[in-house]
Curated annotation (Swiss-Prot):
Task of the protein: Required for maturation of urease via the functional incorporation of the urease nickel metallocenter.
One Pfam match: UreD
Subunit structure: UreD, UreF and UreG form a complex that acts as a GTP-hydrolysis-dependent molecular chaperone, activating the urease apoprotein by helping to assemble the nickel containing metallocenter of UreC. The UreE protein probably delivers the nickel.
Family: Belongs to the UreD family.
Native organism: Nitrosococcus oceani (strain ATCC 19707 / BCRC 17464 / JCM 30415 / NCIMB 11848 / C-107)
Record-annotated membrane-spanning stretches: none
Keyword Chaperone annotated: yes
Annotated localization: Cytoplasm
UniProt keyword Cytoplasm, yes or no: yes
The name this protein goes by in its record: Urease accessory protein UreD
Keywords noted in UniProt: Chaperone, Cytoplasm, Nickel insertion
GO CC list: cytoplasm
């Protein structure tokens, strides 16, 4: 019987969920982005692009040829303040392949009262493929933030997605000693839950230093990839060097999960890219083409 390595979920602060939207102060700057993709013959074509407020995408690109459509998501203000909301919905039709990334870090600023929110929903039809590969997210000390991510996969659909977070600004000596982060992440296939995680982290919490929490590291990351690796592929992934931190990779039923803890976002990004270079051909059947924006 094939052994399955179990990598435990990071513990989270026991606390109530964030207040309902009706309890919040009036929203200061709502933004919404809807993207949809369809496969037309051998080409993935963007068929829906709707936005409201300061969320945009650049012109779609085909650096790998017509099968994979690449979009870069832009948030021109450069940061999210208290009361702001970001609502992002991305859908890949049957056998469409969309890759989404960003030009720079997402920054969540200090807020005295109002909660800032992001709702991200990724979904596919049968055979669709989504790659969600953003740059890191920086939580400034004093931020009040709630992030809710859902991924809904249809039969035979595939996804690779990662999330890299930085608590405070470690390069400037700023620690996450105040504020609150509420984060929920769910991944389902055909309505069946494959992955669910909730975290509420309070600034200055003991979890920041605890060996069963962040262990004193200011940077954390999670990578999810649908599918299952064979023993040789698992060995190749686990043999990749991790510099500037520590990490692990587990094969769960129908899902590969990688975790990172470290000092710098660059270390997390480098390891995740190295994993992506192994996982993409193994699970998606196509070698990696590095987005040009990552080299600038």
């Amino acid at each position: 019987m094939k052994k399955i390595a179990v990598f435990k979920q990071m513990p989270c602060e026991a606390a109530d969920a964030p207040p309902a939207k009706t309890d919040l102060l009036p929203l200061s700057w709502p933004a919404k982005l809807e993207l949809g993709y369809q496969r037309v013959k051998m080409r993935t074509v963007p068929v829906l692009r709707r936005h409201q407020g300061p969320l945009r995408v650049q012109k779609h690109l085909y650096p790998e040829g017509p099968a994979v459509c690449q979009h870069m998501i832009l948030h021109p203000p450069g940061g999210i303040a208290g009361g702001d909301t970001l609502d992002i919905q991305i859908h890949a039709g049957s056998h469409a392949w969309a890759q989404l990334t960003s030009p720079g870090a997402a920054k969540w600023y200090r807020s005295e009262v109002s909660l800032a929110r992001q709702n991200l929903a990724l979904s596919t039809e049968p055979g669709g493929i989504l790659e969600w590969l953003p740059q890191e997210t920086i939580f400034f000390a004093g931020c009040q933030t709630a992030l809710d991510t859902t991924i809904d996969l249809a039969e035979d659909a595939k996804v690779i997605a990662w999330d890299i977070i930085a608590l405070g600004r470690p390069a400037s000596g700023e620690r996450f000693n105040s504020g609150r982060i509420y984060q929920r992440f769910r991944l389902r296939r055909n309505g069946r839950l494959l992955w669910s995680e909730r975290m509420q982290l309070l600034g200055g919490s003991r979890l920041l230093e605890s060996p069963i929490g962040f262990a004193g590291y200011p940077v954390a990351g999670t990578l999810l990839a649908s599918g299952e690796l064979n023993d040789q592929q698992l060995t190749a992934c686990r043999s990749l060097p991790i510099e500037g931190g520590r990490g692990g990779l587990s094969q769960l039923p129908g899902l590969v999960v990688a975790r990172f803890l470290g000092e710098e976002t660059e270390a997390a990004r480098n390891w995740f890219i190295a994993l992506w270079q192994e996982l993409r051909p193994a699970l998606l059947g196509r070698s990696v083409s590095i987005p040009r924006i990552w080299n600038t």
